[in-house]
Amino acid sequence: MDSLSKKIQNLGIHDIRNAARFAQNVIVQYEPYQIDIRRATNTDAWGPTPKHLAKVLRNRYQVPLYLMTEYTLKRLVDHIATRPKNLYEKARKDYVNYGSEWRVVLKCLVVIEFLLLNVDTGDELNQIRSCLLTHKHILTREIAQFKVKFSNDGKMEIHERGIRKKGELILQYLEDSQFLKKERAKNKKNALKIRQQGESSIYNANQISTSASYDNIDDDEFDADADGFDSEMDANNVTNFNVPVETEANSNTRRRSHMEEQRRQRREILREQIKNKEQQRKRKQQQDSIPDLIDLDDSTSTTNNITIDNGNNDNKNNNINSNSDDDDDEFGDFQSETSPDTTAPKTSNSKIDDLLDWDGPKSDTDTTAAAQTSLPFAEKKQQKARPQATKDKSKGNDAFSDLFSYSKSLV
């Protein structure tokens, strides 16, 4: 549903016109050749394209060419007429195709010229010429007096001159058979050039176009040679115009030669690429097999550096261990020096507690034994270094003198 809505939103005026034309073709039930002619002579700003003209020409095998020419002239007259025949024609002129009528007229003349220049010589060309001669008054009077009342681009006079010039050219084709033969031969030559250039671009895009080899003279020489040719020459025989007549076998042979040449070139390029890749692979293998002395020196130097670094690391570890041992010793000395400050108040407190014990002081032997068992080794050493007065408590029973002497020893 969303895709349908998007398509409806993206519709333009050209899509709406195409839908209306399709509905009109279905309702009116036009013949296939009429539909092709209507498509080639519509009111679009472009065309008729070569595709449209080719579709018109292919109907010659199903429909006589004079019917196709008559229908083209009928469509031309319908858009030239200033007085509409019915209400439908009036609505079409005043609203639908207003400002674009001249395009239909010019395209009808282009289709007629295309039929004159591209049909086969003989009965087909005679049918078109007889039909145009029958309705010659359309070209002499209606086309010569045609006026463009309004144009969408505002170039009415330019379009009028173009339509009149095209009508005069068709009249010259009808009146001068030699001029018609010359133009038909020139048109065939140009069509052959276009076809050869298209084939060369498809089958030999990288090479120079070979179309110049088929045409060695320019248009001036062509015109100079064409003015004096025999009037009884058949239009199909174009050898006097230096136009090459190629058969289907020759074109197929040339096409095959182009394809074979391209295949041969591709095979050579592929062989060269494979050869280069093989040579590169062999060079790479040789380079890998030869040892690089520079790389070996680098590797040995790196191993030596690694062993040296390992030795240095071992020495560093030994130094660190020795340093750590020294630090441990210093830390022990520091601990032995600082421990008396922390433990001394405890002994003094115990001494004070003994002094404050009213039940009776404990014996000196008990206190010294308890102190010696509780004190660490560092304090024991320090006690040995104390004065004799503090150690020998049995000589004096004054507690305050012992405390005073102990404090002096600490200071």
Curated annotation (Swiss-Prot):
Classification via SUPFAM superfamilies: ENTH/VHS domain
Protein topology in the membrane: Peripheral membrane protein
Boundaries of every ENTH domain copy: 25-184
CDD domains in alphabetical order: ENTH_Ent5
Biased composition (Basic and acidic residues): 351-365
Residues recorded as bearing N-acetylmethionine in the entry: M1
PANTHER family found in the cross-reference section: EPSIN-5 (PTHR12276:SF5), EPSIN/ENT-RELATED (PTHR12276)
Subunit-level organization: Interacts with the clathrin adapter GGA2 and the clathrin adapter complex AP-1.
Protein name: Epsin-5
UniProt source species: Saccharomyces cerevisiae (strain ATCC 204508 / S288c)
Gene: ENT5
